[in-house]
Amino acid sequence: MGLLSILRKLKSTPDQEVRILLLGLDNAGKTTLLKQLASEDISHITPTQGFNIKSVQSQGFKLNVWDIGGQRKIRPYWRNYFENTDILIYVIDSADRKRFEETGQELAELLDEEKLSGVPVLIFANKQDLLTAAPASEIAEGLNLHTIRDRVWQIQSCSALSGEGVQDGMNWVCKNVSTKKK
């Protein structure tokens, strides 16, 4: 097989593009998670004022990840990004217990959005490397995740800093893309 036929074969089987929306409160670790996925330097991260987009190849998919800032003043603009979302990844700071109620409210509002109806959701219980982090099971219970019936969902413990648990979550994403794709 010559080089040209190899290139033609590669071109004929392009990766399926997947639009992923990465949301969560400010300081939850969304950008760190995104940079970890893209194998980029995570030593200097500042709060996201608008949004970041990165494309990551994984298991035959081209994952186009939209990381939107989580500050309170930016959250009303989240809805501008809902259209054509294949997977929602919601990041929670597992160590910031004071904000569990706030993050739960934001997640509940997202799950009620018509444009996100039926979209599979992965909840990353981030910052598990911190001693004060609540386990994913406790967060799932506190946010009543077991009541979600209109979509597939998963909660995944992770540390965006160390990368632990991140790949497990992305494996789930790749497995569940097809449940939303028509």
Swiss-Prot record:
Coiled coil: none
Main location: Golgi
GO molecular function, one term: GTPase activity
Cell compartments where the protein resides: Golgi apparatus membrane; Cytoplasm, Cytoskeleton, Spindle; Nucleus; Cytoplasm, Cytoskeleton, Microtubule organizing center, Centrosome
Residues reported to bind GTP: 24-31, 67-71, 126-129
Lipidation (N-myristoyl glycine): 2
Family from the record: Belongs to the small GTPase superfamily. Arf family.
Protein name from the UniProt record: ADP-ribosylation factor-like protein 3
Organism: Taeniopygia guttata
Gene: ARL3
